[in-house]
């Protein structure tokens, strides 16, 4: 919580509080109303308080007609200075900025003083390689402190980074390098993931070979992560330890509206979308939501986030906002359940994390192992569990609250996207605790975010009437400022503003209940149409995972000559349960009980579901296998064995039909 906000909260309580039970909701409504009615003043005060500026802005925001919002126009700052330098003249100088561990037991503690030293080394190396303001640098790194440092070094020079998730293959990497026009690629020789060596430099070489003479890359800067022998191209490839010498590099001031980074969304077909985030607005918006929605409002708060630096969460809530606000982050270079199921709990206990950030799928994965693993650890430091990336159904919500949090944590579920940069719907436990609701109920529109639900005609829906989630301008500061290589905004308009002109449509299905909570039901394009009824895949999965035997589930719609689409469920059971026809019937009845006879799913038991390495279930892959089609881009697939599981289940289903 900021100082001004604390004062306002106290004043409001003294003046307006009539019933103590209503206090928190009253304050949320007051704060939200203020943010919507006076967005320039609301965000302007926060920007002054939280961020260090070289030059003040001339205009708080400029709303492009029918498009996006530009914030803090005319202001100048540097992201690296805000995340590093400004902490050195305070008590934070020797405070831990990063706690890091690998799956092999390697450990590092990086203080803010260390961070300053390392960022300058990397910035000096990049400058020696010719990187200057406005250049693009592709970062293809594992989840290490060096991956975070590389981002800050690029930003220090006023250049633009484009981080590519280390799980992507050569073609996906090549596409992103080419689209960004990257002058330099930063990578590591290799790293370990679930005990297997992943050779990153080899993939970079393959990507550049694909591009051939069309490659924009002049240099490849290689960090020796494992010491693995790698191919080396003289004149192009450079080892970091040969050029990474310390020299103070003055942070380059940039306009608040200039790009800080490009982050490509992982579409299944077509050209990847390069989402561009600004420097000023992005730093302000993400910092505010770190304090409010992630709840890191106290100086000694520690954030353990299981995301990756290649995703937007890894930009906003592993790299920038925690460091800008001088907090400590915990990062683990592997899956949270490797090499043993309670590794994540061990990390929380060891580093006394106060906020644990993860996905609903990750929680469901951990649930499979039971409660005993969790109970071995003292997790009393936790105040808040943050989940995002997909709908959170009841079972993982309850497990997180009761098993992980001992009934004492706040479950801060959020909705946001790569495009929006930070949370737009959820709770603000860093300010006040609002009553929690479980299931697909995400929470409320967060301050500064005009979020609602509309029908096909673009009119606001009634309570509990399903429709389309939309955002109205002015959009919050951390939201994207455009798409790379889209100078006339044609692709931007077609992708986000064509369904409802002037209104941002992210593609999700939602409703608002009678208490004002927004329920996000999942992607509109994942809606299953059964006998003229629109059913969200997430709705079905929420009900299925409330069955005591079910750990995880994925629902997909398959064309059916009678119903239009039939619901097929792929179910992972908890430890101690075994697949059987009787259990399949139980699960079917469980779904029928809550959703009616129209939704009687076919149940397929599998040991694992295909997921991305960020923990999202790849429903399109399941559907493709079911229909005998190509699975498309599966470079982010965590475990290819999960594909075999689906294929096996489909074959067994087909055999049963022929018997």
Swiss-Prot record:
It catalyses: 3-hydroxypropanoate + ATP + CoA = 3-hydroxypropanoyl-CoA + AMP + diphosphate. The modification N6-acetyllysine is found at residue 616. Coiled coil: none annotated. Pfam families: ACAS_N, AMP-binding, AMP-binding_C. GO terms for molecular function: 3-hydroxypropionyl-CoA synthetase activity; acetate-CoA ligase activity; AMP binding; ATP binding. The active site is at 525. Keywords: Acetylation, ATP-binding, Ligase, Nucleotide-binding. SUPFAM superfamilies: Acetyl-CoA synthetase-like. It comes from the Archaea. GO terms for biological process: acetyl-CoA biosynthetic process from acetate; carbon fixation by 3-hydroxypropionate cycle. It is an enzyme of class 6 (ligase). Its EC number is 6.2.1.36. Belongs to the ATP-dependent AMP-binding enzyme family. Plays a role in the autotrophic CO(2) fixation pathway. Activates 3-hydroxypropionate to its CoA ester. Can also activate propionate, and to a lesser extent acrylate, acetate and butyrate. This is 3-hydroxypropionyl-coenzyme A synthetase. It comes from Sulfurisphaera tokodaii (strain DSM 16993 / JCM 10545 / NBRC 100140 / 7) (Sulfolobus tokodaii).
